[in-house]
Amino acid sequence: MGRKWNNIKEKKAQKDKNTSRIYAKFGKEIYVAAKSGEPDPESNQNLRLVLERAKTYNVPRNIIDRAIDKAKGSDDENYDNLRYEGFGPNGSMLIVDALTNNVNRTASDVRAAFGKNGGNMGVSGSVSYMFDHTATFAFEGKSADEILEVLMEQDLDVRDVVDDGNLTIVYAEPDQFAQVQDALRQDGVEDFQVAEFEMLPQNDIQLSDEDKATLEGLIDALEDLEDVQNVYHNVDLDS
């Protein structure tokens, strides 16, 4: 569970740094979700899920409203979801998810970030087979045993429920996101530290301090790109 817990800590840390970048990325994602269907979360499941995730990052209401209003208007900006896979130092693997209105620009920017920061791009499928697409929830106030019983009563067979420090963490199938979150809310969970879709590595690796510094520079360069939404990797940065 080490890598998964590190991933939770990284998600929590992201909330405390560069919030304007996080808000901008959610604004784009909310716009795309609202544009793809009705701009109402009650009738648009994709929009509802994005808004639920945005809550855990405290995305301001005005940013959410602006994105939805833009989707309601005559704006016809089209975005594509893209995934890039690549390698960092000494066997480290990275997945980069992007949302872009200019595929050529994004591909060039991502390739340059890899090349200038000790990494190299891979082909589609070269890395992703070592990761699992997962719905992840983290919250306080309930034990893993309590939550497991609640989920079993709802016939929700999730991947894992663990206690770690003061948090309880639930790992579920991606298509269980809404059902699991609803079940947790019904049991009294109101505040989620994490409620996200993630690509979790099946195994984590350890790097030397020098290689970790190189990897962190690569991650920062990728996350700073306007079109990049998420960067996942298979390294235990706390070891």
UniProtKB/Swiss-Prot annotation:
It holds the Pfam family Transcrip_reg. Its main location: cytoplasm. GO terms for molecular function: DNA binding. One of its GO terms (cellular component) is cytosol. One of its GO terms (biological process) is regulation of DNA-templated transcription. NCBIfam families: PRK00110.1 (NF001030), PRK12378.1 (NF009044), YebC/PmpR family DNA-binding transcriptional regulator (TIGR01033). Gene3D superfamilies: 1.10.10.200, 3.30.70.980. Keywords: Cytoplasm, DNA-binding, Transcription, Transcription regulation. It is found in: Cytoplasm. This is Probable transcriptional regulatory protein Sca_0317. Belongs to the TACO1 family. YeeN subfamily.
